[in-house]
Amino acid sequence: YYMDCAGKAVEYMAEGNEIWCHGQMNQHNILYTNGQWQIVNFEHILYAPAIIDVSEFIRKISEKNQWDYRMGERLLNKYESGCPMSEQARKQLLGVLLFPEKFWKIADHYYGSNKAWIPKRDIEKLGKIIAQERERITFIEKVFAISI
């Protein structure tokens, strides 16, 4: 299942316009000080498709809010009110959000650890990811008006 999601994600991301991206765009790196918004912590800057930072932000916020698709629609509408997305960019965003990033991260952590057993904490994290999967897919289907 996760391999299929990853394959679809790669297809959607294939044609990307690349720019310098923050690389770790989340709520912790956006500050409001002296009446202005500031973006901080550029340690993970990378040259990548432009949609990477938007997708990272939407993913992080959505995970923290149980993949509430109404909030996802509001985030996307707000973003597009200042920076309209092409159909290609929307497909790229879909691809990034469809990619099973959390599952992949935990599996990679286990694989790289060279342990003969799966740590209890990793099993707990996998259980949480699997429990949220239906909400994540519903979020994607409703925000992008597709069926997976």
Where are these regions (language model features)?
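Active-site catalytic-loop/activation-segment of kinase and kinase-like phosphoryl-transfer enzymes
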Residues: 1-11
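Gram-positive cell-envelope targeting signals
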Residues: 2, 37-39, 58
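Active-site acidic catalytic loop and adjacent metal/ATP-binding pocket
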Residues: 10-52
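Active-site activation/catalytic loop segments of kinase-like enzymes and analogous catalytic loops
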Residues: 51-84, 97-115
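Helix N-cap / loop-to-helix initiation motif
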Residues: 85-89
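ATP/Mg2+ or Mg2+-diphosphate-binding catalytic cores
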Residues: 104-148
